[in-house]
Amino acid sequence: VKENIKGSFLGGDTRASGYGYYTWQADPEQTVSGAISEDKAWETYYHSILICNITLDNIGDISGSKAEKEDLKAEAYALRAYCYFMLVNLYGQPYNQATAETDLGVPVNDVVGMEDRKFVRESVAEIYRQIESDLKEAITCFKASNLTKTCFRWNLPATYLLASRVSLYKKEYDKAIEYATYVIAAQPQLYDLSAMSDDDYFLNEKNPEILFTYGYYLVSYYAWLAKCNFPISDDLQALYGDNDWRLTHFFYKRRAVYTAQKSETSGTTGIYGYAFRTAEAYLNRAEAYAGKGDKDKALQDLKTIREKRLKVYEEVQAVTKEDVIRRVREERRRELSFEFHRWFDLRRWDRPRIEHTFTPDIKQPDVVEKYVLEKDDPAF
């Protein structure tokens, strides 16, 4: 299993800006010059957690109907759960039931103001308990409010989707299936890519599978503004093949290479940002079925997706449990590429060996440095 991008210096090399991430440095914010840039993810997620804490602490003092207050509480709990989920998977160890109680996760911020206090890292298990508690509260509050929501606000189906993802990461397959099934029952339709115009972005207002959308679609500064430096990898491109609409609808071909383009990078009317999608619910459920050894149900969920993605439908060939698991992982890679899933999936699956090459000086293209992330490396 490989990753989804490869290095290139077509159009000038800006990979030096993302040097720390691209070359597996101990401090990923390190630039090629040795300077340390700011870690925006840590700041952004913990700031959001603080706002959620303040909201929940003051919910009794705000005006509004009981239903509106329950809905606001639900949104705060759901957002806080998502922030902790991202933080623990960015900075903590991958979830492993055997070691989760001692593996280091991230701090829990339970304050609503300034305190002279040193926060300590909680265990991975404790962070997942925090996430699950918040999701349970969010689901309860959303059901109590029963308000009609748009895809621009946290809502009940999106919360169930996150719950299915969390359960899948923990290999609690029955729960993952239960939560994913709720999502599919609430919003089963997938975007038929055969009807998608070449002028459209995939994440647009006509896409019926978007449960919740937020922000702008920044694959990353490096992968967007420097597309030619981060085209999709050869093996990812081969995984789609010419029969798959996703190759041309998820990516843009330039100078003989494909780059990610599921959405726009700015606020364009009718074009959405990051999204929670029904397709993930089918994939979460398929992976859970595969993990339980329920081959037929896993393949049925893959079929549902592939019927809307292939020009001519092809059956998935799988005989053993291992075959089914491999096919589910391949489909997940195709469908969810460049949507904040791949790195987390590599961490929780098999943590493979990954090799990157870096060209320090584009005027000397034959001078290449090689950087390797070994299998099961602690850097995962």
Language-model regions: role of each:
Residues V1-L72, Y84-E126, N146-F152, Y160, ...:
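Short acidic-aromatic linear motifs embedded in glycine-rich loops, typified by GG[WY][YF]DAGD(H)
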Residues S48-T55, C83, D134, L162, ...:
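Amphipathic, well-ordered alpha-helical segments in soluble domains
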Residues A158-K170:
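Hydrophobic/aromatic-rich effector regions of fungal transcription factors
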Residues K295-K308:
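Active/binding-pocket-proximal capping segment
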